[in-house]
From Swiss-Prot:
The keyword Hydrolase applies. One of its GO terms (biological process) is regulation of cell shape. It comes from the Bacteria. Bacitracin is thought to be involved in the inhibition of peptidoglycan synthesis by sequestering undecaprenyl diphosphate, thereby reducing the pool of lipid carrier available. Catalyzes the dephosphorylation of undecaprenyl diphosphate (UPP). Confers resistance to bacitracin. It is a multi-pass membrane protein. This is Undecaprenyl-diphosphatase. The keyword Transferase does not apply. Keywords: Antibiotic resistance, Cell membrane, Cell shape, Cell wall biogenesis/degradation, Hydrolase, Membrane, Peptidoglycan synthesis, Transmembrane, Transmembrane helix. Coiled coil: none annotated.
Amino acid sequence: MFDIIKAVIIGIVEGLTEFLPISSTGHIDLVNHVIKLSQSQDFISMFEYVIQFGAILAVVLLYFNKLNPFSKPTAKARNATWQLWAKVIIAVLPSAVVGLPLNSWMDEHLHTPIVVATTLIVYGILFIILENYLKNKSAHITTLADITYQTALLIGLFQVLSIVPGTSRSGATILGALLIGTSRYVATEFSFFLAIPTMVGVLIIKIGKYLWQGNGFSGEQWAVLMTGSIVSFLVAIVAIKWLLKFVQTHDFKPFGWYRIALGAIVLLVMFI
């Protein structure tokens, strides 16, 4: 029963932070140091990523018509959707090439509070610096159709940075997209779309690794997984809608300050 309650809390954290540029993995790592599940470390490591499935479904639900080429009434519209998917896949490739070989090493060495705190602060500072730099500049990529294949690849290269816990997958891609000249709204949406193949790939790897190690799932573990995923799905829907409204009238500096504050608090707790 206590693990179900913990799964609800972790699911809320996942749903709130997955698409905000503040690092869901970093937050979940920190939460796990406070309310760790009463399960094996193998299960906990896998659980942290599997509950992202709920967040993926939230994007699929909210953008189903936009991302479904077969729902389009004309050949031109269908072709545009297929092109969008091609750009998303191109953007995902760098993370796949770099992340796959380093997956096990990162699990063993980088999921620590000091790594999370450091990356939270560093990228928080970068967001503030970038937003100040862009203050009087206009974006030249203002629609998803304006994103070229080359631009998609560049954004994907920035996503590689997110393999370090605390960086934030959405934060890295949004930061890169803004630097390239993408509007905040388009950068945010494209980040959502990149999450689908990226997180599905990570999900497959983590479950595969868990099973390869000879592990299985008990009834309680299935309940914990389902609870965390459902909660993250429901909360992510709210978070996505809120973020899309927020970026239409605000910049990302509040997230930068939040990252710096949280990272500083973690470091203070560690060393005091």
